[in-house]
Amino acid sequence: MRSMNCTTNNTNNTGQNTKNSLGSSFNSSNYTSYRFQTCLTDQIISEAQTWSLSSLFNFSWVVSYFVMGASRMIFRYGWYLATLSLLRIPKWIFFKLHHVQFTLSFWLILFALAVIVFVTYTIMKERILSQYKRLTPEFLPLENTGKSGSSANINAASTQSANAPPAIGSSTTGASSIIDSKKHSLKDGNENETFLSSYLDQFLSAIKIFGYLEKPVFHDLTKNMKTQKMDEGEILLLDSTIGFAIVVEGTLQLYHEVDHSDKDHGDETDHSDTDGLDDQDRDEEDEEEDDDIDNYDTKSCSSNLIDEEDESVGYIHLKNGLGNFQLLNTVKPGNPLTSLVSILNLFTHSMSSYGNSNFPSELSSPIDTTVSVNNMFCSSEQNFSNTDSMTNSTNSFPTFPSSMPKLVARAATDCTIGIIPPQSFAKLTAKYPRSASHIIQMVLTKLYHVTFQTAHDYLGLTKEIMDIEVLLNKSIVYELPYYLKEAVIRKFKTVDKSSGSADLEPKPKNSNASSKLKKPPKAKPSDGIIQSLKIANANANTSSNSLSLKPEFTHHPSSRHVVLGSRDQFNPGDLLSNVPLSRTMDILSPNPIHNNNRNKSNGINTSTSNQHKRSSRSSSNNASVHSKKFSSLSPELRNAQLSTSPLSLDNTSVHDHIHPSPVHLKGRVSPRPNLLPTTSFSAAQEETEDSALRMALVEAMLTYLGVNKSNMSVSSSSIANMSSLNSPQLNEMYSRRPSNASFLMSPHCTPSDISVASSFASPQTQPTMLRILPKEYTISNKRHNKSKSQDKKKPRAYKEELTPNLDFEDVKKDFAQGIQLKFFKKGTTIVEQNARGKGLFYIISGKVNVTTNSSSSVVSSMSKPEQVSAQSSHKGENPHHTQHLLYSVGSGGIVGYLSSLIGYKSFVNIVAKSDVYVGFLSSATLERLFDKYFLIYLRISDSLTKLLSSRLLKLDHALEWVHLRASETLFSQGDSANGIYVVLNGRLRQLQQQSLSNSNTSSEEVETQNIILGELAQGESFGEVEVLTAMNRYSTIVAVRDSELARIPRTLFELLALEHPSIMIRVSRLVAKKIVGDRTVPALTGDPLSIKENDFTSLIPPTKASYSSSLSHKPQNITSGTITFRTITILPITSGLPVEAFAMKLVQAFKQVGRTTIGLNQRTTLTHLGRHAFDRLSKLKQSGYFAELEEMYQTVVYISDTPVKSNWTRTCIAQGDCILLLADARSPSAEIGEYEKLLLNSKTTARTELILLHPERYVEPGLTHKWLRYRPWVHSHHHIQFSLTGTTLMNEGKMHVLNNGALALMDKLIQTEFSRKTQQNISKLLPDSIKNTVENFSSRFMKSKRQYYTPVHRHKNDFLRLARILSGQAIGLVLGGGGARGISHLGVIQAIEEQGIPVDVIGGTSIGSFVGGLYAKDYDLVPIYGRVKKFAGRISSIWRMLTDLTWPVTSYTTGHEFNRGIWKTFGDTRIEDFWIQYYCNSTNITDSVQEIHSFGYAWRYIRASMSLAGLLPPLEENGSMLLDGGYVDNLPVTEMRARGCQTIFAVDVGSADDRTPMEYGDSLNGFWIIFNRWNPFSSHPNIPNMAEIQVRLGYVASVNALEKAKNTPGVVYVRPPIEEYATLDFSKFEEIYHVGVDYGRIFLQGLIDDDKMPYIPGSQETTLNSQVPEFLLHRRNSI
């Protein structure tokens, strides 16, 4: 169209141009050509567009045409086909069939039906009826387990599982990684470490014995430390001038002098005619003791100690007659050379060197070191000579005197020792006295635990230890005046003495004097008794001349008035005993005439006045110290026998020459009236008889403790020490240059290393002398100081807390307030052996016997008294001990000295020989006062070290204190046995590495596994067998938690065996008893030597394949065999769980099962620590407190009730032998909680058990597996019913973040209100029939809350069950196999429930595994009765068995119906979902082993345990074939015993074993066998056929195991009369059930009537009464 327009326009333009003039023709032509070109282009474009549009239209028209045609054709032909197939063809077929007839045979129809039924059944069986086949175990590699977890800590957790091996008798491959990775704690350090790191590690390891040290204290103690290198073979003389020596590198051998003086040791303990000690009442057994052994010549037998195979030298001989030395110990790096007593001497010598000691300095050292330093060693000029000038020739030896130290150390290799000089301890004592007292307290505790406790418990040297108190009583006799004794007796006569003992305690208020004593007033004591004691204490250190004076013996009259001291005149009422008198005391006048004049002036009778005067003078001058026996005393006082001290210089005895004790100088009285101070008393400060008595008792006890006025002033002593330390002489000695003491290291006079830095210098360089001036010498500009102080903040100075009024008078007042007067009747046991010491007793009047228990059992002395009493009380027996008299103590003596020093247990019994009156200071009072007046520890250590005999000193030098951290290895299997170990505190695990014989592995690659032999708790010993037999270690010892041990070196043991053969006999009995005990339970040890003959059960031990059924989970539900956990930690997985409420129930359950138990939370610990709760000493105080609690209680429960980052939570984890992880079983997620992560990071090897808390007694199938799947560090688990009402809402609020605040509250209110109203409306409107129908219909499709049956029987308390399991007192039920005869198990279980007998663990075989599994699942008889009956009906159905028949190649049946019957009973439940612990056994015919199943789907392993050969095919499990467990052990009692069950009820329903003897000759004819069976007149028994022989052959091992189970201790064997029933008589369910019920009732009632029923812990109504409640719930004050 556009082209036409262009043409028209062109024509019009042309006509118009023609009409125009011709002049414009040229322009018109140009314009026409342009327009023509434009129109032509537009025309071309228009034509192209028109063509494309027309083409598109044509294509769409063609497509629509074909689509419409095709659809029409499809519809037409589809309709035709539909009518053809639906109408025409059926119509044609109908008409055709209506006229056609055909015939099919019956067999063809039957065959077609059979094919259809077979196909249908196969489809149904594979799709619907075989759902149980999906419940197969999932096998995952152990290394991939951690990667599949949802938590980020799974890998760390899987690594941690290696640190937590399973229990006794089980094997693990993870534990080997620990032993390989852990460094041997007693070996040398790594060779790749530098010397500096090794030096620091060894040094820090050695000073652990000091406890915690503040940084300034540590700096002052170690800033003068030196190092000394020694070549191999050099000898170091160990005397008091060295200081504290530490082996840093190399090995040193410690030697003790062997001389003939040792043969006189027997006279040391021969205490005859001792004041305060009655030796006439000793038993004749004392004379038969080791006196002959003590006289044994050690030198003559020293050659017997040398082992030819031992590389170490037994003894050495020194030249020039310096003596022979016997090897005591080999000291390795990180251990100190200095003994505990020597450490105490370092502190006490520093004080005594400045005149603060009560004893002469020449007697201060317990080791005789009389060698002069100047004569013994080279001069100082030689010390500074060059090393090149040193020569090792014998000519260069110095000339030694005849006396040598008794201890020397010989360098076994090139070694380096670090030395802290004695001056450092002197400075430390002067500058930080409280820290010094803390160190002394720590060392005293170690001395008591390591030396004394080991000597008492293990070596039986109780007499040697108690000789300390004997010597103390001999050297100090402090007798009270007779009138004070009569005053005490008079007071107690008014008290009711029917109870056998009475006490008079101080009261703050006044009370009747006849019943209670008044509190002493805050006034200074009189000058009578008290001041004469001051004379004794003051004169003890004045001069040696006064020591030789004999005391003045005077007769004490029987007057009863209080001697208040000599005064100018007497006042009216002086004859009254308790009348307060006001007086002024002047200086005591020695002139008696002056006093007589005073008396006469007052008008008093001369005779009476003289009597008072003599009494006053005698009491003031002598203070009743070392007085004679009184002639005119009351009958109660005539038993007091006093004599002079046997250690006086006039009284020479054998003992004084052998073992001089400096404490005999104390208590001497030298009348020095001019030394008495002037003391005035006002009217308000009046003294009574009570106060005088208390002050006299206090001064008597302080005298025994070594405390007097001169050594109890912290200000004077500190000032004197600091002034003396700052003197030029001492500054020169303390300067950091080589002092004379530093060159006492080597007889070659080699230069010592000055410090750590100098040790790296060249040995040829000359030692540099360092001169250091004090900081006070610096005078600097004030501006400079201010600028520095502004730039850098001054560090806070460390200051110790000191008592402001630390005075001797204040000490006496505080002690007097805590003293008590007690009375004990004759025969009363005041303190029991191995019980905690009560305190310090001062005998006022009477006598006491100090005895020890002589038990027939060697281990009884090492066992806890609580355990003996608890076990004996269950059986109605009392432990009988024969008491052996050691010595007797009379009036004026003390008892309980050693146990009261640190408040530890008593080694002896203290029994009242007669009616005895004592003054008593309790342990709590002593601890409080010792902490307040800390200088007393210096005095105690000074006195104690000088009372030790040479034998105890030898033990102290040789015994080694070993500290192990958690997971640290003590020694490994195959190491040389160099000592015996005694566990002082903590817990150890004993592992043994065994090789697995596997035919698939090559000889070069031998698989090994670690078998746990047992665990060692406090008080147990190990290593005796290896030491006695000189063999290597047969096991590896790993610390479960932080532990302390005492090591008895092999050389010391051999030396003691020669000196004391009784020690060898004692240890031999102990080893024999251990071996016999191990052989009684060979399954616990796995020792092949313990297998008896014909014991086929022991030849089939469990292997690791038996536990591979649950994601390679280890056999961690096996509890400890005979292990009882001493400490238990309750730790939640996450916060918000009721830890404290759970712990309270568990502690109460422990008490109900007969265990003395205490629960510790943070409040309890803070209450005990007091003011040390938040300082640096809290850890030290805690460790001692926890060790003490383990001694007192059988079980200590640590309750982690603090946040995860608190120190108390870490302490609970570190202290637990068994850690209970609390978890809410209903929690939707089973992720690792924050507390659990802390547990994994702590690397503890303690046993970990998971506690799943359920509100009802029901476990959802698979719930436990969800918790255990990614927790391989969990050894076992328990299901506990515990209400979580209060904590559930809290947890739900934390989990559902959106529903918080008011929205959550409104949502809950709306839901509860609407649901309640809706239910009410429905119940009103709908009839009951419709409502029930709707509810029943909806319950099938809607998940509603189920109601579970919860039994209310008391004996089924879950906390009692947990307490019995953890304490090793579990009750086990073992059900044997026997087919249909096992239905009687139901009857026996019903009888057990009727008697109220709880069941904690269930095990079974065959039908016993089925019935036991049902009972373990629900723990009630009601729901399992119907299930067992239903299963019996299915098995007895003939049609079901016929449909399960197959071609009898392997078995007669396919096992499908049997599998389905078990699966329908247990469903998807796993064994770990059972409410109580359960196991079953099976026989692995592939590996020829017995397998124990405790994890996995219940139906599979119960089916495996019931797989009777021939009837059922073996169950395939990971390539192995499992058959009935009865072929190996039809009554698995051994496994139950290994799980820690003390009482086991074993029900045997197996067929009777036919033991009829056969007689048929050497050959046998089959026809004669048939004839013999049918011959009624034949006398020959029926010969078994081949099937019977095969059956008997299969049960050979089971028969021997059954006989062994019957003879196992603690097993109650039950066998109902079911012999007449066959194995497959399941149709006789009711009959067999009633047989079991009737027999069970009769059997159990017979046990009760015959008093043979075993003790059932927790069945009694009464619980143990404890003096300390399970919780000390104190409210903590705000900080």
From Swiss-Prot:
The modification Phosphothreonine is found at residue 803. The keyword Disulfide bond does not apply. Residues 261-274, 788-800 have a biased composition (Basic and acidic residues). It is found in: Endoplasmic reticulum membrane; Lipid droplet. Keywords: Endoplasmic reticulum, Hydrolase, Lipid degradation, Lipid droplet, Lipid metabolism, Membrane, Phosphoprotein, Repeat, Transmembrane, Transmembrane helix. Residues 1-21, 261-304, 498-527, 586-672, 775-800, 855-882 are annotated as: Disordered. The keyword Transferase does not apply. A nucleoside 3',5'-cyclic phosphate 1 binds at residues 803-947. InterPro entries: Acyl_Trfase/lysoPLipase, cNMP-bd_dom, cNMP-bd_dom_sf, LysoPLipase_patatin_CS, NTE, NTE1_P-loop_dom, PNPLA_dom, RmlC-like_jellyroll. A motif (GXSXG) lies at residues 1404-1408. The active site is at residues 1406, 1524. Present with 521 molecules/cell in log phase SD medium. Belongs to the NTE family. This is Lysophospholipase NTE1.
